[in-house]
Amino acid sequence: MTVTVKMLVDKLKLKVIYGNEKLLSKPITTADISRPGLEMTGYFDFYSPERIQLVGMKEWSYLKTLTDHNRYSVFSNMFKEETPAVIVARGLDIPEEMYRAAKENGVAVLQGRNGTSSLSGDMSWYLNAQLAERTSVHGVLVDIYGMGVLIQGDSGIGKSETGLELVKRGHRLVADDRVDVYAKDEETLWGEPAEILHHLLEIRGVGIIDVMSLYGASAVRNSSQVQLAIYLENFEDGKVFDRLGNGNEEIELQGVKIPRVRIPVKTGRNVSVVIEAAAMNYRAKQMGFDATKTFEERLTNLISKNGED
């Protein structure tokens, strides 16, 4: 996904001190952010001009100790054609030399009201999410009790219908049919809808419905962490399914492993309720409450007791 300076300005509510439409359309190619401390002393080895340059109180205070000529020299060396923008945090005044060098080198000058650490954290979170590599998977992503559940299965098994039933039960739709997933870090997987499919759900026999229009803003989410995968498959006699819940099946997406539960589908079975139970059971396990383990302990104790008798 392409992220521009204008998108960052809108997301973080930054003030544009200098920058025309062309400069605000510059792409940001990396989520890494530069705090140009050593660069202000004239040391530019290993400098990364393609990063957003963030000036905080420490850098700003040091700049005040320099002469006008040296301040201008620092910014002239710092600002390159590939530099997306420079951001001054805490609403600090923009040095005249910074403004002049930015104008000469075609770099947008922005100002943020938040503290440097807060601004840096918000930028990193946003840029990492937007610039992460994405993979599209077939399925329905629903937020169930605050936990992202990816529902997959064969075509025609009833994934979208199950998603609709879950929405009617108070849960929130994230994506239907195509789910774009990306890793924010090595252990966290997120999913979002394709741009053209936002808030839309396809139901065979009915067509495409707008979930937000029918059920309100509380029935949808723009993105969600993916924590559990559900695979729906037709129930067949003789086919073995996990009955104790001690299976450890996982799927891997974008290098992140998430647990998967297989649920058999047959006429008369309320699949949405079963998925709710699977989601709550997974959350309970994360909190240390494992019903399977409790059952196994009770069974072991009962066998031991009967053996003694």
From Swiss-Prot:
Keyword Nucleotide-binding: yes
Binding site for Mg(2+): S160, E202
GO MF annotation list: ATP binding; magnesium ion binding; phosphorelay sensor kinase activity; protein serine/threonine kinase activity; protein serine/threonine/tyrosine kinase activity
Annotated control of activity: Kinase activity is slightly activated by fructose 1,6-bisphosphate (FBP) at low ATP concentrations, and is inhibited by inorganic phosphate (Pi). Moreover, FBP, phosphoenolpyruvate and 2-phosphoglycerate, but not fructose 1-P, fructose 6-P, and ribulose 1,5-bisphosphate protect kinase activity against inhibition by Pi. Dephosphorylation of P-Ser-HPr by S.salivarius HPrK/P is strictly dependent on the presence of Pi, and is inhibited by FBP. FBP seems to modulate HPrK/P activities by enhancing affinity of the active site for ATP and, conversely, lowering the affinity for Pi.
Record-level GO BP terms: regulation of carbohydrate metabolic process
Entry EC number(s): 2.7.11.-, 2.7.4.-
Noted pH dependence of activity: Optimum pH is 7.5. Active from pH 5.5 to 9.5. At pH 5.5, exhibits less than 15% of its optimal activity.
Annotated region described as Important for the catalytic mechanism of both phosphorylation and dephosphorylation, given as residue ranges: 201-210
Domain of life of the native organism: Bacteria
HAMAP family per record: HPr_kinase (MF_01249)
Note, other: Both phosphorylation and phosphorolysis are carried out by the same active site and suggest a common mechanism for both reactions.
Function per UniProt: Catalyzes the ATP- as well as probably the pyrophosphate-dependent phosphorylation of 'Ser-46' in HPr, a phosphocarrier protein of the phosphoenolpyruvate-dependent sugar phosphotransferase system (PTS). HprK/P also catalyzes the pyrophosphate-producing, inorganic phosphate-dependent dephosphorylation (phosphorolysis) of seryl-phosphorylated HPr (P-Ser-HPr).
Assembly information from the UniProt record: Homohexamer.
Domains: entry comment: The Walker A ATP-binding motif also binds Pi and PPi.
UniProt name for this protein: HPr kinase/phosphorylase
Organism, as annotated: Streptococcus salivarius
